[in-house]
């Protein structure tokens, strides 16, 4: 976070030079028409002096981010459940980079300690961010089973109370500007959570009124639903396991599992339509190429080495 943005309301480069009344008293009096400007100048001078004597204040509250706070936030994404949750949100409709940045800002505004950087607080803050920013209400309900487990239907009223408590703790300042989000992301731009770009066709206030297609929430036991906008089989999104918790072999195993699922799915399609055999070969090759790119990405990216070091 840049600390050179402490700007007072009056631009510091503006200087007003006004002659004092004592200098004017020794001057030869002009016609009476100058008396009113003299009074006006005196009033303006006192107004400017009173304004300049006010203590300089920043234009708005600023966040001072400590290294250990950002490190604790990033460690949340070492959680297997949160990683699976992000993989499930393959279209980045619930947890794109801006919503995740808002989640971090809520942690800061709530003055969470390191011990309060927990899974449940992450989901509560993310739910609040969705409530504030997203027009589509149904998508955020997917958070319930991930945060609360199989008994989420009994527990979600208490979850909403915790959301309200967080809202109160941040003094009801739930709006986060785009600029603030981008400055948070600029601290460690190479981290994989800041690569979660939402597609344009999932932006804006576009509702889906066909309730028979998908029943939400689906929970951790379900696979990501096919997206009619991103393609029949959905959009492949980099899970981006952090280097601190997972090696390249982990993502190879994961992509291998997805590849097998794709193979089985396409094999069933071929049974119904043998003419798709050539298409399957091309899709499988494309998927293998993507898998290799993901492996290379994990090997090359050491995104959070700076945060892993102890402060000097």
Curated annotation (Swiss-Prot):
Residues 67-199 are annotated as: Speedy/Ringo box. Its main location: nucleus. GO terms for cellular component: chromosome, telomeric region; endoplasmic reticulum exit site; nuclear envelope; nucleoplasm; nucleus; XY body. The modification Phosphoserine is found at residue 221. It comes from the Eukaryota. The keyword Chaperone does not apply. The modification Phosphothreonine is found at residue 223. Keywords: Cell cycle, Developmental protein, DNA damage, Nucleus, Phosphoprotein. The keyword Phosphoprotein applies. One of its GO terms (biological process) is positive regulation of meiotic cell cycle process involved in oocyte maturation. GO terms for molecular function: protein kinase activator activity; protein kinase binding. It is found in: Nucleus. PANTHER family: SEEDY PROTEIN A/C FAMILY MEMBER (PTHR31545), SPEEDY PROTEIN A (PTHR31545:SF4). Interacts with CDK1. Interacts with CDK2. May interact with CDKN1B/KIP1. Identified in a complex with CDK2 and CDKN1B/KIP1, where it interacts primarily with CDK2. The C-terminus is required for CDK2-activation, but not CDK2-binding. Belongs to the Speedy/Ringo family. Regulates the G1/S phase transition of the cell cycle by binding and activating CDK1 and CDK2. Contributes to CDK2 activation without promoting CDK2 phosphorylation, by inducing a conformation change of the CDK2 T-loop that obstructs the substrate-binding cleft prior to kinase activation. Interferes with CDKN1B-mediated inhibition of CDK2. Mediates cell survival during the DNA damage process through activation of CDK2. This is Speedy protein A. It comes from Rattus norvegicus (Rat).
């Amino acid at each position: 976070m840049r600390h050179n943005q402490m700007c007072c309301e009056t631009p510091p480069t503006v200087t007003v030079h006004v002659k004092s009344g004592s200098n004017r008293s020794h001057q030869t009096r002009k016609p009476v028409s100058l008396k009113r400007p003299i009074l006006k100048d005196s009033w303006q001078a006192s107004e400017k002096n009173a304004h300049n004597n006010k203590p300089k204040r920043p234009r708005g509250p600023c966040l001072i981010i400590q290294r250990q706070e950002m490190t604790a936030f990033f460690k949340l994404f070492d959680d297997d459940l949160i990683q699976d949750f992000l993989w499930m949100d393959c279209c980045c409709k619930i947890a794109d980079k801006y919503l995740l940045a808002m989640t971090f800002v809520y942690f800061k505004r709530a003055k969470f300690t390191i011990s309060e950087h927990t899974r449940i607080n992450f989901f509560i803050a993310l739910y609040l961010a969705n409530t504030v920013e997203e027009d589509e209400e149904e998508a955020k309900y997917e958070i319930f089973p991930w945060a609360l487990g199989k008994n989420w239907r009994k527990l979600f009223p208490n979850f909403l109370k915790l959301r309200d408590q967080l809202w109160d703790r941040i003094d009801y300042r739930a709006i986060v500007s785009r600029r603030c989000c981008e400055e948070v992301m600029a601290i460690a731009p190479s981290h994989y959570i800041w690569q979660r770009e939402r597609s344009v066709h999932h932006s804006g206030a576009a509702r889906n009124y066909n309730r028979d297609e998908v029943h939400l929430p689906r929970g951790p036991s379900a696979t990501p639903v096919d997206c009619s906008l991103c393609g029949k089989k959905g959009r492949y999104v980099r899970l981006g396991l952090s280097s601190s918790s997972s090696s390249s072999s982990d993502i190879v195993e994961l992509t291998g599992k997805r590849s097998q699922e794709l193979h089985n799915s396409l094999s069933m399609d071929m049974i119904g339509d043998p003419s798709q055999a050539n298409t399957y070969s091309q899709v499988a090759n494309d998927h293998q190429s993507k898998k290799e790119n993901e492996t290379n990405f994990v090997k090359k990216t050491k995104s959070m080495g700076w945060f892993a070091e102890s402060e000097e």
